[in-house]
A protein has these predicted regions:
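Regulatory sensory/coupling modules that transmit signals to nucleotide-handling catalytic cores
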Residues: 1-3, 113
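Conserved nucleotide-binding and Mg2+-coordinating catalytic segments in signaling enzymes
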Residues: 5-25, 44-58, 66
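Short beta-strand->loop micro-motif that forms the acidic, two-metal-ion catalytic signature
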Residues: 50, 65, 71-73, 83, ...
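Catalytic-core segments of nucleotide cyclases and related cyclic-nucleotide turnover enzymes
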Residues: 54, 58, 102-106, 132-165
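A short pre-motif secondary-structure segment
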Residues: 81-84, 123
Length: 166
């Protein structure tokens, strides 16, 4: 019974991913177990969720959220951990460097593009992703690292908006 309650308290009901609490606990554990190693923290955001919900309904918005969770988990693979930490926000943590962060970001874009071209959905599923490289250790505060990755996401969103306007 305790295992079931623990699972439910750390899982996101919509996506089956870790929720914020579960992700933070797992990230702290990974940090503790990998002192001195480099890790990439990715912070991702589903683009245009409000417009999807407003135009096509919350069932479609939920579908887009689930699809984003699947795409991110697929790109990260078994070497890392992913979670949905808020409404349309996702995080991942995996061993690697900046090149790995860029590779994951590009893979997610390719998977979203593939889904969008094959889908009969009247909207696009797209994720903006920022990442931050850390060196694990006892002095690392995971919430601070997530803030840094969130700032990188914000910069990525600004760049993407500018490139779309051109």
């Amino acid at each position: 019974k305790n295992e079931v309650l623990n699972f439910l308290s750390e899982s996101d009901a919509l996506t089956g991913s870790l929720n914020r609490r579960g992700f933070m606990e797992k990230a702290v554990q990974i940090n503790r177990e990998n002192a001195g190693k480099e890790m990439v923290i990715l912070f991702a955001d589903l683009d245009h969720l409000k417009e999807i919900n407003d135009s096509f309904g919350h069932i479609e918005g939920d579908f887009a959220i689930r699809r984003c969770a699947e795409v991110l988990k697929s790109a990260v693979g078994d070497s890392g951990v992913t979670g949905r930490i808020g409404g349309d926000e996702f995080c991942a943590m995996l061993p690697g460097n900046a090149g790995d962060g860029q590779r994951i970001r590009e893979q997610v874009r390719r998977e979203c593009d593939g889904f969008n071209s094959d889908s009969d959905k009247p909207y696009y599923v797209e994720l903006s992703i920022g990442y931050h490289v850390i060196r694990c250790g006892s002095d690392l505060v995971i919430s601070d690292v997530l803030k840094d990755a969130d700032e990188a996401l914000y910069e990525e969103k600004k760049k993407r908006r500018k490139s779309v306007k051109k």
